[in-house]
A protein has these predicted regions:
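N-terminal subdomain of nucleotide-sugar transferases
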Residues: 1-63, 203
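Conserved nucleotide-sugar donor-binding subdomain of glycosyltransferases
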Residues: 66-122, 168-191
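Glycosyltransferases and closely related glycan-assembly transferases
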Residues: 103-116, 125-147, 190, 197-198
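Active-site proximal beta-strand in glycosyltransferases
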Residues: 116-118, 135-173, 200-201, 226, ...
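Membrane-proximal helix-turn-helix segments that form the acceptor-binding/catalytic region
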Residues: 140-141, 145, 169-199, 206, ...
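Carbohydrate-associated surface elements
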Residues: 205, 236
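Acidic anion/phosphate-binding donor-loop and adjacent secondary structure
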Residues: 228, 237-248
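Conserved small/polar residues in nucleotide/adenosyl-binding loops
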Residues: 253-256
Length: 256
């Protein structure tokens, strides 16, 4: 199951890290619509509960190994039982606030304190926010840095401030124009940009583009403020997938 270029990056990037130097792990929602063939490979690790303001929600953690990489899956049928990963924005803003909190609270449970958490797009935009505002005083999280990657500036995860505040329990002062507020709404992408330690995007030219009024989707001023922390990195090619020696869609296989 994949819905775009983000899936290609998350699926391919981790396996190319040097396993002797880096302990790379991936954590994803356990969507009901994931491939049924994968389910028998998942092993239950644990369960716990997270608070979303006044809500208390179940979190189940499953794990599996693929291409030498450890994957974790966050289970919650209230949020992830749909027929597709993304629904309407009203449901998604609560779903991904839950996911961001569940990821952070899973770390001490699975006894893994990463040096860096790599977040992708607005769906994980609140993770750097939660890390610095809610968990910043907890010694377990001290020293954990975040990298926030923007794949498409157009999709920002915007919704009513009152309802986002109700879901997240974030303090009122965060919903200002210098942090999460954006034209009267709360903006998850903006939160990630403001709170992440470093920001990357899919190419050097796109990094330049999102700093302009034409490409910044209203956030160009903020991107200019954070330009020193912004890097454009071209997506690589997964040679296990795009291999001219094995590609059945070309007339002749060949070695390059």
């Amino acid at each position: 199951m994949k819905t775009g270029g983000l899936a290609d990056v998350v699926g391919s990037l981790p396996k190319y890290f040097d396993k002797d130097r880096y302990d790379v792990r991936v954590i994803l929602p356990k969507y009901k619509c994931m491939d049924d063939k994968l389910l028998p490979q998942l092993k239950f690790v644990c369960h716990f509960y997270v608070n979303l303001n006044w809500r208390r929600q179940y979190v189940g953690i499953f794990t599996s190994q693929y291409d030498g990489v450890t994957y974790y899956f966050v289970d919650n049928e209230f949020y992830f039982a749909g027929d597709k990963p993304y629904n309407n924005i009203y449901e998604d803003v609560e779903k991904f606030a839950f996911f961001s909190k569940a990821v952070l609270e899973a770390l001490p449970v699975i006894d893994f304190a990463p040096d860096v958490i790599h977040c992708n797009d607005w769906q994980t935009g609140l993770l750097p926010v939660f890390l610095k505002t809610v968990y910043g005083s907890d010694n377990f999280y001290a020293g954990i840095k975040t990298v926030f990657t923007i794949h498409n500036m157009k999709f920002q995860g915007r919704w009513k401030i009152k309802e986002v505040a109700d879901v997240t329990g974030l303090p009122e002062h965060i919903f200002n124009s210098g942090e999460l507020e954006f034209y009267g709404e709360a903006n998850y992408l903006k939160g990630g940009i403001v709170y992440a330690d470093e920001i990357t995007t899919v190419s050097p030219t796109y990094a330049d583009e999102i700093c302009t009024p034409e490409g910044g989707e209203g956030l160009d001023g903020l991107m200019l403020e954070r330009r020193r922390h912004l890097r454009g990195i071209v997506n690589g090619i997964d040679y296990d997938v795009f291999n001219p020696m094995k590609d059945t869609s070309v007339s002749y296989t060949h070695l390059t």
